[in-house]
UniProtKB/Swiss-Prot annotation:
Protein name, UniProt field: tRNA (guanine-N(7)-)-methyltransferase
UniProt cross-references to NCBIfam families, sorted A to Z: tRNA (guanosine(46)-N7)-methyltransferase TrmB
Residues annotated for substrate binding in this entry: 164, 196, 234-237
GN (gene name): trmB
Function: Catalyzes the formation of N(7)-methylguanine at position 46 (m7G46) in tRNA.
Phylogenetic lineage: Bacteria, Pseudomonadati, Pseudomonadota, Betaproteobacteria, Burkholderiales
Enzyme Commission identifier(s): 2.1.1.33
Catalytic activity annotation: guanosine(46) in tRNA + S-adenosyl-L-methionine = N(7)-methylguanosine(46) in tRNA + S-adenosyl-L-homocysteine
Enzyme class at the top of the EC tree: transferase
Gene Ontology CC annotations of this record: tRNA methyltransferase complex
Region (Interaction with RNA): 166-171
Organism: Cupriavidus pinatubonensis (strain JMP 134 / LMG 1197)
Start-end of Polar residues biased regions: 1-11
Length: 256
């Protein structure tokens, strides 16, 4: 289900997932022996329409990265449940969910500039007011801009599977990041992951189940959840299903 994209070093899993550019160090409060990345290096040109959206819409919807707590009410102009999305790619899924759930605030972290421009363009065209973007690595954003118990949900959709065994350690869903995310969730808040790589799906269940603060929202023996209605089926996912490929959703909630 991985479409080829000759202009990039890594191939997105679907039309919404494009992970992006520069390494950061693990936050001080997370023990980890190596650098944590929430993205992979990508290339790609920003179209004129995307650049126009960055220039004209960006000042309204882009929140500058700063290593101090985010003022959610100031950023969104209201108090509302807060959802973080890590790596929104070209933004179609993010825009769809934000329109479907206008009562929630959606903060997307993405460093890939064409993706940022694409989501800004969608938000402007569809008059979506409950999206904000931080164009910075998500690990640093979570560690330094998000306080404990501030999130109602986290979305991680189709992260790079790093399917070769020797590359598995590069996967995004790892215990240090999950521990950090759990600390930022409110009691009852959720982490929702989706992948089309079965082995990674099982690893997601294992890693999330290994975090004491979380519990599986599913009672299924395999630990997987049904796809929530708010997550749309992308065109590549639909094509993969026709070819007999699977997609797995994993949802865990914070205890308490």
């Amino acid at each position: 289900m991985h479409p080829q994209d000759a202009s990039t070093e890594q191939t997105p899993v679907d039309d919404d997932q494009v992970e992006s550019s520069q390494p950061v160090h693990a936050p001080e409060d997370v023990a980890h022996p190596r650098r944590i990345r929430s993205f992979v290096r990508r290339a790609g040109r920003t179209s004129s329409g995307q650049q126009r959206a960055i220039d004209e819409v960006g000042p309204r919807l882009i929140v500058p990265y700063a290593p101090h707590p985010l003022d959610w009410e100031a950023a969104f102009g209201r108090k509302a449940p807060a959802i973080l999305e890590i790596g929104f790619g070209m933004g179609e899924t993010t825009a769809h969910i934000a329109q479907l759930r206008p009562q929630d605030n959606f903060l997307g972290c993405e460093v890939h500039e064409p993706g940022v421009g694409a989501l800004l363009k969608l938000a402007d065209e569809r008059e979506i007011g409950n999206i904000r973007i931080i164009q910075h690595d998500a690990v640093e954003v979570v560690a330094h801009m998000l306080t404990e118990d501030c999130l109602d949900g986290v979305h991680i959709y189709f992260p790079d599977p790093w399917h070769k065994k020797r590359h598995n350690k590069r996967r995004l869903v790892q215990p240090p990041l999950v521990k950090l995310l759990a600390s930022r969730l409110k009691p009852g808040g959720y982490i929702h992951c989706a992948t089309d790589w079965e082995e990674y799906a099982h690893q997601m269940v294992e890693v999330l189940a290994g975090e004491p603060a979380l519990e599986n929202a599913s009672s299924a023996a395999d630990g997987f959840s049904e796809r929530p209605e708010y997550r749309p089926i992308t065109k590549f996912e639909r094509r993969g299903v026709r070819l007999g490929h699977g997609v797995w959703d994993v949802v865990f909630r914070k205890r308490g």
